[in-house]
Structure formats: structure tokens, C-alpha cells
Amino acid sequence: MSLSDPIANFLTSIRNGQLSMNKVIVVSYSYVIHAILQILLSEGYIDGFTEKSKGSNIKFFEVKLKYYNGAPVISQIARISKPGKRCYCSAKDMPKFYNGLGLYIISTSKGIMSDYNARKSGVGGEILCGVF
């Protein structure tokens, strides 16, 4: 497991956890992952998350995955901007993910937010991932 792209590792952990119908997954700690988890929680894609620690300096998150009628709530989660090819957009040119049914998570100068909030605030940025 390479940590050259921790966001991709995090998204893959969610995808694999839901494919194997796990209720809880463990992901590494970072401020970016914390912000993404807060967005996923506020939009209703996960049931919750808690920050835990092992020893004095090893932190991680326990994420409760959400299911509806036995099927995962997140049907697709994908990394858009990658370390080798960054993807930026302005507030005017920001696309809608699945015609507004899904959401993009954007890293802006005002913090990490959903595409709806970025459009509302009038800021663009790097498109981190898409969730549907």
C-alpha cells in the first residue's frame, strides 16, 4: 500500500469496505480526509466517523459506512484530480456530477467543500473526487 496519494487510498478503502459489506472501516488520519469525511457525513453518504489514536502519535479514523436496503449508499466514488494530472475549474465552469444527483468535493482557497457550496461562494479550485 503506497501512501503517495492518501486521498486515493481513503477512497479505495471506502469502495472496498462497501463491496465487502463492512459496517466500519479504518482509514489513516489527515486534515484533508477529515474535511472530506465531514462533507460525506453532512450529505448523508456515511453514518459517522470517530477519531482514534494508538499510542501517542498514531491517529486514524473509524468510519461507519451507510447502507440502504442492504445496498451501499455510495454507488460510485472516484478520484478526479490525481498527483500526475491535476484538475482545476472556476466557479462558472464547475460541472455537475451526474446532473446534480452526485457531488464533487472541491479544494478551494476557502477550504474543502462540496461543489454546490463552492458555486454558492463563487470560488473554484481543485476537484478532489466525485461521489454518487
Curated annotation (Swiss-Prot):
One GO biological process term is: translation
Instruction: Give an example GO molecular function.
Output: rRNA binding
Q: What is this protein called?
A: Small ribosomal subunit protein uS8
UniProt entry keywords in alphabetical sequence: Ribonucleoprotein, Ribosomal protein, RNA-binding, rRNA-binding
Q: What does this protein do?
A: One of the primary rRNA binding proteins, it binds directly to 16S rRNA central domain where it helps coordinate assembly of the platform of the 30S subunit.
UniProt xrefs under Gene3D superfamilies: 3.30.1370.30, 3.30.1490.10
Q: Which family does it belong to?
A: Belongs to the universal ribosomal protein uS8 family.
**Superkingdom as given in the UniProt entry:** Bacteria
Quaternary assembly: Part of the 30S ribosomal subunit. Contacts proteins S5 and S12.
Q: Name one GO cellular component term.
A: ribosome
Membrane-spanning ranges? none
Which InterPro entries does the record match to this protein? Ribosomal_uS8, Ribosomal_uS8_CS, Ribosomal_uS8_sf
